[in-house]
Amino acid sequence: MGCFCAVPEEFYCEVLLLDESKLTLTTQQQGIKKSTKGSVVLDHVFHHVNLVEIDYFGLRYCDRSHQTYWLDPAKTLAEHKELINTGPPYTLYFGIKFYAEDPCKLKEEITRYQFFLQVKQDVLQGRLPCPVNTAAQLGAYAIQSELGDYDPYKHTAGYVSEYRFVPDQKEELEEAIERIHKTLMGQIPSEAELNYLRTAKSLEMYGVDLHPVYGENKSEYFLGLTPVGVVVYKNKKQVGKYFWPRITKVHFKETQFELRVLGKDCNETSFFFEARSKTACKHLWKCSVEHHTFFRMPENESNSLSRKLSKFGSIRYKHRYSGRTALQMSRDLSIQLPRPDQNVTRSRSKTYPKRIAQTQPAESNSISRITANMENGENEGTIKIIAPSPVKSFKKAKNENSPDTQRSKSHAPWEENGPQSGLYNSPSDRTKSPKFPYTRRRNPSCGSDNDSVQPVRRRKAHNSGEDSDLKQRRRSRSRCNTSSGSESENSNREYRKKRNRIRQENDMVDSAPQWEAVLRRQKEKNQADPNNRRSRHRSRSRSPDIQAKEELWKHIQKELVDPSGLSEEQLKEIPYTKIETQGDPIRIRHSHSPRSYRQYRRSQCSDGERSVLSEVNSKTDLVPPLPVTRSSDAQGSGDATVHQRRNGSKDSLMEEKPQTSTNNLAGKHTAKTIKTIQASRLKTET
C-alpha cells in the first residue's frame, strides 16, 4: 500500500549546452531527485563544462506557454512548478545569465570560449543585430577559430557557405568573410575568439536581456536589462536609458511593473509598464533585482545586502540573489586564475551543404542540394538544438492539448533557424507562426490564391471500413509530431511524399482531347459571332463617297467657248462663279490613340461634299478644299476681275479671265473656258 502515498522522486533531465551537445542527469547516475536543490544541478553542469567563473552562467527552462525562467539555486526542483509540469523528461538550457561588461577581461580561456559560443548564437538567432561589415568581421574570426589559417588547397571556393553566422545569410557576406579570413594568418583559436568578443562588445545590443511590455495606449515597448542599467526601446529605437545608481525602486503588482528613477533634480519619477501576464511581470521583476544586485552591490556583508534588496521587494514577494557580485568575483583571491595547464576542448560547429554556383542549371542545383542534405543527415549523429531566447512575443498561450504542443521534449520549443520574436521583428512577424506563415494552402495547379480552392487530390472510395479507419489513424499520427528535425517527422515527410507520388500516378488523366475540344468550341464561337472580330483600325465603307462623287460630277459642266468672232464686250459677258470662303483653317491632329483617330476621321467625313472634293482634287490637282460657308454667283466686268487679282485677298477666290493662246500654225486665237455651276472650286484651262 506504500505505492499510493509515496511521492515519485525519479528525475530525468537533459541539459543542452552551448556547443550543441547534451548532458543527461538522472537519479540512477547522479542521484538527482525532485527534492534536490537547484544548486546541485548547477554544480554538475559546471563540473562537466570545467568552469570556475560560474556566477555568469545559469540554467533556463520554459513552461507550456513558452515563458522562460531561470533555475533558482536556493529552491528544490519540486518547487519549480513550471518545470515539473513540463515533464518528464525535463529540459534545461545552459547559457549566460549575466553578460560581462568587458568579456575580454575574463580570466580563463574556457570562460571566454563559453561567452564566444553564446554571443555567436545571439548573432545567428538575431538577438544581437549588427551591420554587414561587422558581421563579416565576426564571421571571419569565427572561421579562423574553426578552421585555422586559410589553405587554398583545403578551402575551396564556397567553403564559408558551409557555416551559418547571421540570419538570412547572403552570398555577398560569405565572399566578404572569405576575403577577411585570408588576412588573419597566424591567429590561434583563443586569439580569434578574443578578437570576436572585442568586436561584439561594442555593439549596441550586446548583453541586453529584452522583455516585451506595453506602454500607454497599448503601444509595444521592450525593457532591456544591461550591465549598466535599464534601456527602453520602441520601434527599434532607444527612447530611454536609466543607470542602476539612479534606480531607487523596482516594484510589480499583478501585471503592472513600476520603475522608479531619481532625476538630476533629486526628484523621483515612476515609470509604469504592463506585462502580458502575471508570470511574465514577476519574471521581469526577478531579473531586474538580480541584475541590480550583480552589477551594483559590492558589499560582502549579508545584512547590508539584505537591506539593499528589501528596497526592491514587492508586497508578499521577497527575492534575494545568493551568488557573488561582479566586483566580488574580480577581487576573489581564493582561487588562482587562470589555472595552469588548462586544456580547452572545442567542438565543431554544425555544417550545411555548400552553396552551389548560380551558373548551373536549376534542376542540377535542386538534385545536388537534396543529395547533400541526405548525406549530411546520414553523417551527423547529433541534432542541432538552440537554447531559447529570453524575448517572447505577445502571442497567447497555445492549448496544451493542441498538436503543436505535443512535441518531443528533447527539442527546444521553437523552430530552428525560424524568425525570432524580439525587438527587430515587425508586429506582423511576431504574431505569425514561423512554421505555417500562410493561413491558406495554395492550389498547385492554379496561378493565384484567388483561383479555385478545391482540393486537387482525388481520394478513392474504400470498400472496407477498416481500411478507412487505418488511413485516418495514419494521418492522425503524422500530424501529431511537429518537432523540428525529429526522425519521426522526417519519416512522416518521406511517407507523405511517397503517398503523394503514388496518388498522383494513379490519378493522371490525358487532358489533350478535352483541351482540343475547348479550343475548337471557342474557335467556332468566334467565327459565328461577328462582334468578336477585333481590328486595330476600323474599316469604313467607301460607297457613300463614290455615290456623292458621281452625283457631283453631273453638275460640273465643261464647255469650250470659242472666243473668235466675239467682241470685247461679249468677252466681258462670259459668265463665271464667284466663291467666297470664311472660317478657321482645318486643324490636323497627330494622335496615336485609335479612339481619337476614329473621332477625327468621323469629323472629317461627316460632310459628304467635303470628303468628295478632297478625293476629286487629289486626282485633278485642284487646290485643297476649304470649308464653304457662303456661295454667290455674280457676273462682273473684267475690271472687277482685275481688281480682285490686284487685291490678292486670301479669303476670296475668283476665276481668271479667259486667256487666249496663239496658234502659230493656224494663226488663230482660241480660248477654252471651263464653266462650273454649284462647285466649290474653279479652274481655267487655256
Swiss-Prot record:
One of its GO terms (molecular function) is cytoskeletal protein binding. It holds the Pfam family FERM_C. Expressed in many tissues. High levels of expression in brain, liver, thymus and peripheral blood leukocytes and low levels of expression in heart, kidney, testis and colon. Residues 331-686 are annotated as: Disordered. The keyword Zinc-finger does not apply. GO terms for biological process: actomyosin structure organization. It is found in: Cytoplasm, Cytoskeleton. SMART domains: B41, FA, FERM_C. Residues 357-376, 418-428, 673-686 have a biased composition (Polar residues). Disulfide bonds: none annotated. Residues 11-299 form the FERM domain. One of its GO terms (cellular component) is cytoplasm. Signal peptide: none annotated. Keywords: Cytoplasm, Cytoskeleton, Phosphoprotein. Its main location: cytoplasm. The modification Phosphoserine is found at residues 304, 389, 393, 402. InterPro entries: Band4.1-like4A_FERM_F1, Band_41_domain, Ez/rad/moesin-like, FA, FERM/acyl-CoA-bd_prot_sf, FERM_2, FERM_central, FERM_CS. Residues 479-489 have a biased composition (Low complexity). Residues 518-527, 547-561, 648-658 have a biased composition (Basic and acidic residues). Residues 588-601 have a biased composition (Basic residues). This is Band 4.1-like protein 4A. It comes from Homo sapiens. The lineage of its organism: Eukaryota, Metazoa, Chordata, Craniata, Vertebrata.
